[in-house]
Amino acid sequence: MSLKRTRARERALQALYQIDVAAEGIDDALSRFWKSFEPVEREVMEDAEGFVRGVAAHRRTIDDTIEGVSTNWRLDRMAKVDRNVLRLAVYELLRTDVPVKVAINEAIELGKKYGSESSGAFVNGVLDKVAAGLPPERRRTDR
């Protein structure tokens, strides 16, 4: 796990949360978001923006995937932090360049850090179900 990628995920989650709360466009939200931070490493900022734009571009598929495995939980009823941790993680799970275990573990840590006491377990449960639906070659632990 790269520390820069971890920081990028953290910034992406914060930006996704802000976008969710403010219900505004990505460009305006990202511009305002970055102004609220001390200078951020270029690579971290680029990766974070890539995550945010990727989630936005695939949001319908991501949300459908989450709702498909979230028994008795609609997205609009989930805590905003949990919802956005899941969106970020599912985006990574649907890509092929991020190991499944890394995406899940990073999401669990984000849930624990920014969510409620039960967020880590909730995120883990949902993402385990999403991962179970991935093609077998994608689920391999050596990826």
UniProtKB/Swiss-Prot annotation:
Transmembrane residue ranges: none
Disulfide bonds: none
UniProt keyword terms in alphabetical order: RNA-binding, Transcription, Transcription antitermination, Transcription regulation
GO terms classed as biological process: DNA-templated transcription termination; transcription antitermination
Pfam families assigned to the protein according to its UniProt record, in alphabetical order: NusB (PF01029)
GO cellular component terms given for this protein: cytosol
GO molecular function terms listed in the Swiss-Prot or TrEMBL record: RNA binding
Top-level lineage group: Bacteria
Family as reported in the entry's similarity comment: Belongs to the NusB family.
Purpose of the protein: Involved in transcription antitermination. Required for transcription of ribosomal RNA (rRNA) genes. Binds specifically to the boxA antiterminator sequence of the ribosomal RNA (rrn) operons.
NCBIfam families named in the record: nusB (TIGR01951)
Entry protein name: Transcription antitermination protein NusB
Organism (species): Anaeromyxobacter sp. (strain Fw109-5)
